[in-house]
């Protein structure tokens, strides 16, 4: 059995080598971007949800640069962030241009830190993205807190420059991914408008058949009437009143991560099923849909990465990533890396027919601001 496994692994790595060689030839030595590396990631048992998100994040350049800069700092106790930094550093410093890397240390750490991922079952890529970004932000905040405490112990006082800098809750994760929504409620009796801000690292949007991501975002901020048992308690009127409620974007992030809500619970089936609806996502996205006091009311975004779900349900199927690197597109399917045409992205919009049919459809979109 062991001999068979060894032969199987050897054959697999030979195939990877052939794929890598073909990719290098297809791109061409003259066109190959300087200091760029395209490495597939080994699947450690249904870890495609993780591999696809990591590849997408690696090609979000601001995020990659921050992770690599973090890796160059003095070594800290091992955690999920240090493991991610080691993985990105390993990819960025390979002698070869293309190949395969096993993210074993990262996966081991992930399974150790969160029991949700401590198994060999398929997991949700969006849940993993959310967990990863929030964990990194928490670790950075804790490190900042520790550094300030150490500074106080060493010097007897905190560095005033540090003390007056960015708020303690703000990290480079927030600087890259965080946007702000304003929840506006207008009382229909006294016309008083109350608003509440809410920060986000990604936006989850409902999907409909034969629409576009622009349409989904527009629906996200539609006005809702609060009436009957859902009336709004107005502080001015001091009673429950009918009201209009809507969500608007107050601050747009540097990188906008959009999660398409493709998994819906069906009462008649007593389970979640996939909405394979066709949702067009353009290579360029201009956002106007903002609040009156928006800090950046208009912003142009470029699509840089897409996490794609392949299959018919949330707990079965497969995840791949398509990313933009310089002027061309690549498809990462675990250890396989292929160059694709920009037109091929249309294949990942979804289907115009059955909702639960097998499909390869965009699940998480990463748009990077031009400014």
Curated annotation (Swiss-Prot):
Q: Which residues form the USP domain?
A: 39-370
- Region: Disordered; residue ranges are 148-169
Lineage, top ranks: Eukaryota, Metazoa, Chordata, Craniata, Vertebrata
Q: Please provide the Gene Ontology terms (biological process) for this protein.
A: protein deubiquitination; proteolysis; regulation of protein stability
Recorded hits in Pfam families, A to Z, give:
UCH (PF00443)
- Quaternary data: Interacts with WDR48.
Q: Which reaction does it catalyse?
A: Thiol-dependent hydrolysis of ester, thioester, amide, peptide and isopeptide bonds formed by the C-terminal Gly of ubiquitin (a 76-residue protein attached to proteins as an intracellular targeting signal)
UniProt entry keywords in alphabetical sequence = Hydrolase, Metal-binding, Protease, Thiol protease, Ubl conjugation pathway, Zinc
Q: Which GO terms describe its molecular function?
A: cysteine-type deubiquitinase activity; cysteine-type endopeptidase activity; metal ion binding
Q: Which residues form the active site?
A: 48 (nucleophile), 318 (proton acceptor)
Superkingdom to which the source organism belongs:
Eukaryota
Biological role stated in the UniProt entry: Deubiquitinating enzyme. Has almost no deubiquitinating activity by itself and requires the interaction with wdr48 to have a high activity.
Any keyword Chaperone?
Answer: no
* The protein's name in its UniProt record: Ubiquitin carboxyl-terminal hydrolase 12A
The primary gene name is usp12a
Source organism of this protein record: Danio rerio (Zebrafish)
Compositionally biased intervals (Polar residues): 157-169
């Amino acid at each position: 059995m062991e001999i068979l496994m060894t032969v199987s692994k050897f054959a697999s790595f030979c195939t990877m080598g052939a794929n890598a060689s073909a990719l290098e030839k297809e791109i061409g030595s003259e066109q190959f971007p300087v200091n760029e590396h395209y490495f597939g990631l080994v699947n450690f048992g249904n870890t495609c949800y993780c591999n696809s998100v990591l590849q997408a994040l690696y090609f979000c350049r601001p995020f990659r640069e921050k992770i690599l800069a973090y890796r160059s700092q003095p070594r800290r106790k091992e955690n999920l962030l240090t493991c991610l930094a080691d993985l990105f550093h390993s990819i960025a410093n390979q002698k070869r241009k293309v190949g395969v890397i096993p993210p074993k240390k990262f996966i081991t750490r992930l399974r150790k830190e969160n029991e949700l991922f401590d198994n060999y079952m398929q997991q949700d890529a969006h849940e993993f993205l959310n967990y990863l970004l929030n964990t990194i932000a928490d670790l950075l905040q804790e490190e900042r807190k520790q550094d300030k405490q150490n500074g106080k112990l060493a010097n007897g006082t905190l560095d005033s420059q540090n003390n007056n800098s960015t708020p303690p809750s703000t990290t480079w994760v927030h600087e890259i991914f965080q946007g702000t929504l304003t929840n506006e409620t207008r009382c229909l009796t006294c016309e008083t408008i109350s608003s509440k801000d809410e920060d986000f690292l990604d936006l989850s949007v409902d999907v409909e058949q034969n629409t576009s991501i622009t349409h989904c975002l527009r629906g996200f901020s539609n006005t809702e009437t609060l009436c009957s048992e859902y009336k709004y308690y107005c502080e001015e009127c001091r009673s429950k009143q009918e009201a209009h409620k809507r969500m608007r974007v107050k601050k747009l992030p540097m990188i906008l991560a959009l999660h398409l809500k493709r998994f819906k619970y069906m009462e008649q089936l007593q389970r979640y099923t996939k909405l394979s609806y066709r949702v067009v996502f353009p290579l360029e996205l201009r956002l106007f849909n903002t609040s009156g006091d928006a800090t950046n009311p208009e912003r142009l975004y470029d699509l840089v990465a897409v996490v794609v779900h392949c299959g018919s349900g949330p707990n079965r199927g497969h995840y791949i990533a398509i990313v933009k690197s310089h002027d061309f597109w690549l498809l990462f399917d675990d250890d396989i890396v292929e160059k694709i045409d920009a037109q091929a992205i249309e294949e990942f919009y979804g289907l115009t027919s059955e909702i639960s049919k097998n499909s390869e459809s965009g699940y998480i979109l990463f748009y990077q601001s031009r400014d």
